[in-house]
């Protein structure tokens, strides 16, 4: 999925699109084209959401890449207040890698969170779950 997102965003070459991730690396294609639009926050999920919300409030599109369940659980209050508050109508924040999809089975139970979609639904956040990365 990372390579697909990296190529997709890199080909768009759009200054209004940002990628924020939590220590996920492998976004070289997009980063080469838009070095100021890729932000690695490390494993600080609440900060990832706060930064994404601030950028989205400036009418930018923000892709948040990480283990979605970790982001949803660790930053739920920020999502509830920021994403569903002032940022939702000014920009779009797109969380990637939702649901227990098998991507991180070797990383242990902490990476296999299966209720992130239900938590998003509780906040009336639209969720889409494609079955493949498209190559």
Regions found by a protein language model. Give the residues of each.
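Thiamine diphosphate
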Residues: 1-135
